Amino acid sequence: MLDTKFDELMDFPCAFPFKVVGEAHETLTDKVVAVVQKHAPGDYSPSTKTSSKGSYHSITIRVTVTSKDHIEILYTELAAIEGVRRVL
């Protein structure tokens, strides 16, 4: 797992925003929601912004997380989506 201190800084469960930056592709948002649904089923309405040149999408999604491990798993799996450049 990742070496983070989320467990020291946060009280769980809590809403946690993930920002996924990836290549502009029409299915990127659906892929992000699918990964989140796998680990935290719910009703999600992510916001999407397109870069000035249209090359990248930035998707922000708020997820109710239950532990440090839950956050780390989501970071790892979101980063593994094809075309994703960063997960913040």
From Swiss-Prot:
Q: Which GO terms describe its cellular component?
A: cytosol
Q: What would be one Pfam family of this protein?
A: DUF493
* Span of the signal peptide: none
Q: Which family does it belong to?
A: Belongs to the UPF0250 family.
What the entry lists under NCBIfam families is as follows: PRK04998.1
State the name under which the record lists this protein: UPF0250 protein Sbal_3280
Source organism of this protein record: Shewanella baltica (strain OS155 / ATCC BAA-1091)
